[in-house]
Amino acid sequence: MEKGLALPQDFRDLVHSLKIRGRYVLFLAFVVIVFIFIEKENKIISRVSDKLKQIPHFVADANSTDPALLLSENASLLSLSELDSTFSHLRSRLHNLSLQLGVEPAMESQEAGAEKPSQQAGAGTRRHVLLMATTRTGSSFVGEFFNQQGNIFYLFEPLWHIERTVFFQQRGASAAGSALVYRDVLKQLLLCDLYVLEPFISPPPEDHLTQFLFRRGSSRSLCEDPVCTPFVKKVFEKYHCRNRRCGPLNVTLAGEACRRKDHVALKAVRIRQLEFLQPLVEDPRLDLRVIQLVRDPRAVLASRIVAFAGKYENWKKWLSEGQDQLSEDEVQRLRGNCESIRLSAELGLRQPAWLRGRYMLVRYEDVARRPLQKAREMYSFAGIPLTPQVEDWIQKNTQATRDSSDVYSTQKNSSEQFEKWRFSMPFKLAQVVQAACGPTMHLFGYKLARDAASLTNRSISLLEERGTFWVT
């Protein structure tokens, strides 16, 4: 009697074994199963999410970057690029094998038609803009440059829901997996598939209606007709529209509004590495332009300590009690943040073929000093005409007589605001940032303060002039 076959050790052994014994039916079934998990974009997100929810409960710091993604420990952890490469390699092998066997991957034809509704806005002219930033860099303010334009569908931080619903470990493959989930959700949103958010909204929408979309009121497109449905008594939205009362958000109507607009723009502070956006840049259904917004890391930290006081208790304690040393974990986290930003910017400024003409680096300080000029540059880069409506908003909201006390306000006396941190930051705090983020500050043209006097001396500039160097 013939011995039972041992289970093959890798995919190649399986293919070889199946070919030898002619068991094509079993192989095709395997291919179909794998395609369901890898190729089907909408389903993979929910499946990955469910899997990751089983990881021990950990709320990720929105401002932290896992150093393991930059330098893996003992080469035992997968970096994002390695994990992404593994997925792409398996996808390619399955595609080639299925063609050899005469099987056409069904998902390709389905995805090819996914963006057809957007062609109503004008074939070949639709732009997709991603404002890539970190918290407290002025991204809400700069995002308004796109939100105020009537023909742009703008979303404010939709990835917030993913971070609050799916819990990731700080290190290793789980952190890389989070980036893949963010990317897949981001792609579907840029394609106006807003249903992709529903599994991550808590509590879940009913009949595509929700009262809990994060910062709905920060998107004009979600607060205008026909998306703004009649107000329902005793039904109150957590993040309501600012200037009018609307009923719960109808996700179907929101998606339709997105497809009617000429362009799509989205602000995200949870995108860690520029390289992971390559599949989106190369997707033929998207014409993606990435604007990376950066700010002096000293100003960022000063702002975060105020805005996220609970997360920065260790810093506040260190400052108030006069301790000599800050926790090394805190310093490492700060260094990881800066390194992540620097590596993304260096990649963008190198202009690899896939990113050429699709990346722009902008300093918040330049926007604050010359908001209208920088808005024109960003719109020119995106290939979208700037309207008088946006220009008027910029004029009115960058010359406020006094800054709002709201840390999330988008109304600023911007020419004064960008240096305000210098006069409230203790010099020893500036020293920690300068030591941890020196290479990043050098790349972006932020000068080091030599002492407490130079930090608070307004006549001493801590900013190098960089001109059009920032547009690539």
UniProtKB/Swiss-Prot annotation:
Its EC number is 2.8.2.17, 2.8.2.21. The keyword Transferase applies. This is Carbohydrate sulfotransferase 3. Disulfide bonds: none annotated. N-glycosylated. GO terms for biological process: carbohydrate metabolic process; chondroitin sulfate proteoglycan biosynthetic process; T cell homeostasis. One of its GO terms (molecular function) is chondroitin 6-sulfotransferase activity. It catalyses: chondroitin beta-D-glucuronate + n 3'-phosphoadenylyl sulfate = chondroitin 6'-sulfate + n adenosine 3',5'-bisphosphate + n H(+); 3'-phosphoadenylyl sulfate + keratan = adenosine 3',5'-bisphosphate + keratan 6'-sulfate. Widely expressed. Highly expressed in spleen, lung, eye and stomach. Constitutively expressed at low level during the mid- to late-gestation period. Expressed in the brain in a temporally controlled manner: peaks at 2 weeks after birth in the cerebellum, but at 3 weeks in the cerebrum. Localizes to stromal cells in the bone marrow, and stromal cells in the marginal zone and red pulp of the spleen, but the sense probe did not. It is found in: Golgi apparatus membrane. Residues 39-472 are lumenal. Pfam families: Sulfotransfer_1. Sulfotransferase that utilizes 3'-phospho-5'-adenylyl sulfate (PAPS) as sulfonate donor to catalyze the transfer of sulfate to position 6 of the N-acetylgalactosamine (GalNAc) residue of chondroitin. Chondroitin sulfate constitutes the predominant proteoglycan present in cartilage and is distributed on the surfaces of many cells and extracellular matrices. Catalyzes with a lower efficiency the sulfation of Gal residues of keratan sulfate, another glycosaminoglycan. Can also catalyze the sulfation of the Gal residues in sialyl N-acetyllactosamine (sialyl LacNAc) oligosaccharides. It is an enzyme of class 2 (transferase). The gene is Chst3. Belongs to the sulfotransferase 1 family. Gal/GlcNAc/GalNAc subfamily. GO terms for cellular component: Golgi apparatus; Golgi membrane. InterPro entries: Carbohydrate_sulfotransferase (IPR016469), Gal/GlcNAc/GalNAc_ST (IPR051135), P-loop_NTPase (IPR027417), Sulfotransferase_dom (IPR000863). Residues 1-19 are cytoplasmic. Keywords: Carbohydrate metabolism, Glycoprotein, Golgi apparatus, Membrane, Signal-anchor, Transferase, Transmembrane, Transmembrane helix.
